């Protein structure tokens, strides 16, 4: 190809003139910087590219919340922070039970039961400094005390932050010890919750130098109590003709009426006129656990760090963190109670105690040094986290399998002998987990002022989960010697207790309790090795820079343990009944490896205006599904099951193309950042659970592809002396780009190799199959089109006092809780924990005002001033429609002291 010399000369002239103008303006800016501009927007330093630099110079979309802003906005945890972060969604069932999503990259979310065993690994990385603390289904709930900042890095960060950063990364950056500085602070607050119990918090920080120029320590201690605000109101639970499992009794109506005088439920095989419950079944009540404001939560923690400066080049930072979180009750409201009664906002009907205990300790270390001209950083960490959670699962009794586990003597119950008998519906699930997470990373980098500069690193990670999860919804008595004798003599039947497989790896081996119907005692995790590099080349120094980087990764993933459930062979069987499945013998192991890369072109039009283009790739590892005896499901029209559930699922991937502007005007009094992106998310990891069609266990498979287009705007303005206005906005348009189907893979089925379109349900009726992957053009979960926030703060002096007034608003657009999976906004008896609901948009308002004098600060604050009870996460996770509402209006006072 012949080049056009005139065009080449024109391009060269334009770039040369831009470079000259840029260098000239840089010199002027440098001279101007010698004069302090008190009205300029404060520069924010981040380490998003593994080096300290001004956030305005980083060619990706970054949102930051500084230490001052964390205090000003009364942000204690991520649930408080997310309202100031457009394009970031947070689906949570309560404290310590959250999933974080960015830019609408979510297949949906569910309850926390079994998430440690079956959930995909997160696609948003969560970091405490340089230590990864992410976890499937329940990201670490870190109280944001004595933090330097929170960084939110949007878009794939796979090159520098690895597999968990497919959609982005969130980094909590702690304050580090300061040499030769003695300082400290203390804050205390008290507030009241509308319609709920009061809240209180105290924290204290001390920085203490021990050896001049060499050693300092920093410690923070905190306690935070948040009062409950959701009432567990008195209720009953009565088995109904319309329950999904009523067919198991084998009773039909007479002249269109059931024995209880009510219309029948849906027809079943052999019962074409509908199904009925028998008379005389027990009615369950919750009088022993009904309570007002039943969902308080307490955080207690301490963090101690020490910095030793060996010389000008080498230092060692050690940090130890402990946190204990204890929450009671349920953090959702039920629009409809367990017996179909309409409830008021902030009410539930729960029948068993519920609580969540979440404790972690984290040790981390960082060595900074220099060898000749090469900067060296070695960092590592070791996290130990344990959780113990119990949740009410009484509404499972209305599902397709509830009566199987809770009744005997019917043709579809676990034991078909003896009189027709049902037991209590008050049941729960109990999930104990232990997570260890060890990481090591070493990075070498050249001086940043070199024209060609680079970063090279190596990474090792060992991530393991132990999960002992028991679904305690079997109320049929266990087969103790006495119960078994009664059953064998013609009395009510019993069901033997389940146990782990004696040949498998088990955290808590042995027989489970009488009420355990199904569960798993398993271990899962991976080891990862990675190498990564990033190289910058200044095409025109200080003006035009080209960056390229890549990461090679290698995952060794495993799963071992035991799974067990109450089969019909447990009927009238001495405790324990036949042992659970041995996962060790299956050999669940997978290896994933490959490269993920990124590239940037950064153009400093002037020192205060930056344009960039970024190409980046992200990924997350695959995983394993439950391996029970129910792996063949979806009975077809010919009576043959059509689908072998996959034993594993593969990684999904994300490709991002992004352009952006970062700029400051009017002597750094106005900041305007704008970005636009086009992303392709392929073969997403899609969780499926449909007891009426696909069996009674959840599994994950690779499903649809999505195309995401969006824009994001961030504004900060120093309008007048003392007045700052800032806001941010995101618009996200995400659509499914293909139309896959669930394909029959059983060679014995007449539909083998074809899309599954019909399935015989547990009641024996042929029904249309749900389009579990959704149609082309469908939208993903937690992907609101529009989000924005705006706030203003005015600071002024009153004599010796410094006063401030701040107010803000936050809007979250409507969104769905699941992908378009063939289910609807259902209120009655959910057939799955993954029903799709629409969550309407909402707007909240906050305000604060205060004064400071010398070392003291006093302020009054209010959050959710409009007292909205909008749902932040709607689901059928506990077999009843539940909505996790915003915390009601909180009004309080905070006092601070620093020295």
Regions of interest found by a model, annotated:
Residues 195-327, 361, 434-439, 445-461, ...:
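Transmembrane beta-barrel wall of Gram-negative outer-membrane proteins
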Residues 454-455, 546, 678-680, 701-820, ...:
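Gram-negative outer-membrane beta-barrel transporters
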Residues 114-119, 123-154, 204, 245-247:
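Short acidic/polar hinge/loop motifs at secondary-structure boundaries
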Residues 230-292, 328-351, 392-430, 470-521, ...:
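Solvent-exposed loop segments that connect transmembrane elements
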Residues 78, 98-101, 114-115, 165-188, ...:
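N-terminal periplasmic accessory domains that precede
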Residues 471, 478, 809-826, 850-899:
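C-terminal beta-signal and adjacent terminal beta-strands/loops
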Residues 1-87, 312, 316:
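N-terminal Sec signal peptide and the immediately downstream disordered periplasmic leader
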Residues 203, 364-394, 610-616, 641-643, ...:
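Membrane-embedded beta-barrel scaffold of Gram-negative outer-membrane proteins
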């Amino acid at each position: 190809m012949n080049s056009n010399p005139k065009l080449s000369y024109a391009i060269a002239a334009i770039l040369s003139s831009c470079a000259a103008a840029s260098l000239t303006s840089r010199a002027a800016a440098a001279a101007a910087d010698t004069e302090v501009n008190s009205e300029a927007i404060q520069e924010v330093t981040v380490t998003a590219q593994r080096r300290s630099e001004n956030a305005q110079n980083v060619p990706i979309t970054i949102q930051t919340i500084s230490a001052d802003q964390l205090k000003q906005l009364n942000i204690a945890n991520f649930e408080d922070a997310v309202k100031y972060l457009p394009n970031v969604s947070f689906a949570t069932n309560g404290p310590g039970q959250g999933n974080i999503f960015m830019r609408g990259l979510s297949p949906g979310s569910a309850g926390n039961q079994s998430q440690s065993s079956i959930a995909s690994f997160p696609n948003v990385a969560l970091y405490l400094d340089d230590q990864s603390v992410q976890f499937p289904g329940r990201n670490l709930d870190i109280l944001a005390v004595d933090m330097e900042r929170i960084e939110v890095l949007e878009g794939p960060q796979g090159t520098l932050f690895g597999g968990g950063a497919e959609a982005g990364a969130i980094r909590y950056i702690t304050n580090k010890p300061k040499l030769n500085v003695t300082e400290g602070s203390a804050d205390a607050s008290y507030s009241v919750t509308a319609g709920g119990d009061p809240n209180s918090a105290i924290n204290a920080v001390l920085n203490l130098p021990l050896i001049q120029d060499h050693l300092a320590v920093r410690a923070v201690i905190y306690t935070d109590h948040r009062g409950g605000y959701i009432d567990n109101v008195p209720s009953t639970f009565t088995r109904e003709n319309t329950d999904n499992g009523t067919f198991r009794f084998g009773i039909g109506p007479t002249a269109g009426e059931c024995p209880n005088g009510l219309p029948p439920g849906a027809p079943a095989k052999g019962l074409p006129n509908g199904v009925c419950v028998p008379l005389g079944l027990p009615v369950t009540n919750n009088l022993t656990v009904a309570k007002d404001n039943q969902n308080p939560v307490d955080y207690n923690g301490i963090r101690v760090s020490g910095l030793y400066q060996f010389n000008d080049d080498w230092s060692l930072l050690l940090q130890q963190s402990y946190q204990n979180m204890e929450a009671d009750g349920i953090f959702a409201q039920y629009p409809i109670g367990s017996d179909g009664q309409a409830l008021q906002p902030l009410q539930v009907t729960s029948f068993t105690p519920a609580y969540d205990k979440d404790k972690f300790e984290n040790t981390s270390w960082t060595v900074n040094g220099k060898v000749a001209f090469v900067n060296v950083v070695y960092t590592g960490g070791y996290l130990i986290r344990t959780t113990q959670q119990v949740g009410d699962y009484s509404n499972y009794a209305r599902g397709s399998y509830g009566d199987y586990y809770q009744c005997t003597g019917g043709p579809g119950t676990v034991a078909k002998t003896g009189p027709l008998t049902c037991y209590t519906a008050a049941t729960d699930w109990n999930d104990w987990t232990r997570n260890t997470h060890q990481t090591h990373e070493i990075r070498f980098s050249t001086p940043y002022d070199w024209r060609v500069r680079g970063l090279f690193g190596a990474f090792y990670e060992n991530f393991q989960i132990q999960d002992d999860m028991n679904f305690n919804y079997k109320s049929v008595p266990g087969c103790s010697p006495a119960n078994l004798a009664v059953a064998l003599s013609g009395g009510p039947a019993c069901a033997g207790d389940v146990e782990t497989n004696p040949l498998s790896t088990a955290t808590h081996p042995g027989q489970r309790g009488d009420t355990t119907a199904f569960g798993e005692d398993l271990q899962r995790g991976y080891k990862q090795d990675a190498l990564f590099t990033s190289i910058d080349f200044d095409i025109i120094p200080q003006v035009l820079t080209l960056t390229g980087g890549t990461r090679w990764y290698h995952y060794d993933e495993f799963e071992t343990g035991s799974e067990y459930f109450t089969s019909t062979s447990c009927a009238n069987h001495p405790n324990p009944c036949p042992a659970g499945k041995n996962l060790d013998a299956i050999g669940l192991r997978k290896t994933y490896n490959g490269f993920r890369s990124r590239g940037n072109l950064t153009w400093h039009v002037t020192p205060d205006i930056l344009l960039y283009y970024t190409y980046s790739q992200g990924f997350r590892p695959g995983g394993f599904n439950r391996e029970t005896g129910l792996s063949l499901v979806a009975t077809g029209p010919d009576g043959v099951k059509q689908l072998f559930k996959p034993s594993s699922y593969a990684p999904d991937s994300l490709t991002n193309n992004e352009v952006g502007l970062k700029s400051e005007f009017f002597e750094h009094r106005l900041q305007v950042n704008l970005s636009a992106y086009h992303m392709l998310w392929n073969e997403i990891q899609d969780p499926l659970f449909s007891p009426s069609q696909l069996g009674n266990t959840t599994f994950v498979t690779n499903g649809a592809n999505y195309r995401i287009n969006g824009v994001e705007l961030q504004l900060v303005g120093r309008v007048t002396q003392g007045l700052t206005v800032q806001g941010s906005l995101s618009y996200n348009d995400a659509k499914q780009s293909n139309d896959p189907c669930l394909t029959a893979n059983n060679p014995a089925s007449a539909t083998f190799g074809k899309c599954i379109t019909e399935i015989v349900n547990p009641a024996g009726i042929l029904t249309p199959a749900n389009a579990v992957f959704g149609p082309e053009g469908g939208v993903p979960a937690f992907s609101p089109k529009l989000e924005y926030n705006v706030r203003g703060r005015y600071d002024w002096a009153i004599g010796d006092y410094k006063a401030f007034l701040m107010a803000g608003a936050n809007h979250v657009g409507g969104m769905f809780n699941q992908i378009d999976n063939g289910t609807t906004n259902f209120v009655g008896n959910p057939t799955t924990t993954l029903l799709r609901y629409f969550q309407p948009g909402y707007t909240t308002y906050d305000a604060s005002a205060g004064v400071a004098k010398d070392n003291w600060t006093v302020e009054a604050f209010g959050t959710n001033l409009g007292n909205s009870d909008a749902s932040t996460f709607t689901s059928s996770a506990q077999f009843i429609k539940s909505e996790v509402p915003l915390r009601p209006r909180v009004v309080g006072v905070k006092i601070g002291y620093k020295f």
